[in-house]
């Protein structure tokens, strides 16, 4: 097993909320890539919008200069818009990335309608990617309003799209009422990528964004080591089932902590377990 840094929580504000020119945003993205390498990681997971903004040639330069491998490209809103699928696959091939993660978004409120969109658009990109030796993966999603959370829902998608594998997320099944370890063990043979994430649970709706759970509680992404996920039990299960691929750390910054120190803290938390 190898650790990867999933910088989604750092990229997203730069891409969609912070002001700045393309060049300024690209420079900030490069600082995250450099920091990932400097804090011990050998791999990184990036959002497709980041690759588009910066340009695949510049991303390749940044990765090569930092000595990082691009382990996965994360594509958002795939159920609603699959335009540019050829470009996604082409960029991944150019960057030496062997995995594409598909995130559905929620372009339809009806679960059945959204399921049909997911199957249609996922199938298209899976077929394109497989021709280039690239694996497509989808994850268990914490949004219980879309058909991607429960074990049964995820299994239905995997069964409907041949060649699609699971990104097992170590916390996303909690809002739907599933359990961390049994969920992984059920899908162990169909898991090709893993997100290591922690999650906290609140009885009342918090000020920050949280996913409502089927039990009426609220589920928030949490800094690693501060939430409810039992990582000792999880790593025992991973080794038991022979998982030997990438573990992407879904980084959530610790409030008030220096970013470099925090990224290194999380690396040290898991480095001895792989």
Question: Where do the PLM segments sit?
Answer:
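Acidic/histidine-rich catalytic cores of soluble enzymes
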Residues: 127-228
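A short, acidic, amphipathic alpha-helical segment used as a generic capping/interface helix at domain edges
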Residues: 226-240
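Active-site groove signature of glycoside hydrolases
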Residues: 92-113, 132-144, 248-249
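Distinct, well-ordered alpha-helical segments
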Residues: 54-60, 83-89, 115-116, 144-162, ...
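Conserved beta-strand positions in the central sheet of alpha/beta enzyme cores
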Residues: 45, 72, 101, 137, ...
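N-terminal pre-domain/capping segments
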Residues: 1-99, 130, 163-165, 267-274
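Active-site beta-loop-alpha junctions enriched in small/polar residues
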Residues: 6-10, 47-49, 75-79, 105-107, ...
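C-terminal/domain-terminus segments
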Residues: 245-270
């Amino acid at each position: 097993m190898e650790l990867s840094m999933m910088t989604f929580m750092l990229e997203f504000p730069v891409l969609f909320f912070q002001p700045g020119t393309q060049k300024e945003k690209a420079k900030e993205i490069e600082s995250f890539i450099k920091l990932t390498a400097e804090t011990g990681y050998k791999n990184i997971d990036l959002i497709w919008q980041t690759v588009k903004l910066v340009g695949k040639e510049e991303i390749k330069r940044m990765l090569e200069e930092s000595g990082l491998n691009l382990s996965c490209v994360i594509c958002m809103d795939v159920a609603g818009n699959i335009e540019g699928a050829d470009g996604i696959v082409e960029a991944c091939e150019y960057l030496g990335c062997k995995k594409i993660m598909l995130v559905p978004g929620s372009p339809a409120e009806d679960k059945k309608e959204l399921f049909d969109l997911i199957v249609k658009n996922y199938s298209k990109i899976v077929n394109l990617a497989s021709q280039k030796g690239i694996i497509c993966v989808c994850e268990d999603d914490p949004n219980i309003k879309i058909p991607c959370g429960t074990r049964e829902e995820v299994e239905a998608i995997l069964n409907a799209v041949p060649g699609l594998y699971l990104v097992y997320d170590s916390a996303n099944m909690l809002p739907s009422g599933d359990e961390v370890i049994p969920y992984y063990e059920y899908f162990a043979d169909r898991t090709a990528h893993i997100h290591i994430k922690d999650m906290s649970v609140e009885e009342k709706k918090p000020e920050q964004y949280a996913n409502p759970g089927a039990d009426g509680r609220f589920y928030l992404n949490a800094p690693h080591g501060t939430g409810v996920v039992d990582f000792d039990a999880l790593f025992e299960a991973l080794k038991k089932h022979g998982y030997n691929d990438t573990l992407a750390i879904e980084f959530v910054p610790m409030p008030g902590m220096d970013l470099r120190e925090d990224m290194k803290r999380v690396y040290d938390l898991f480095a001895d377990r792989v």
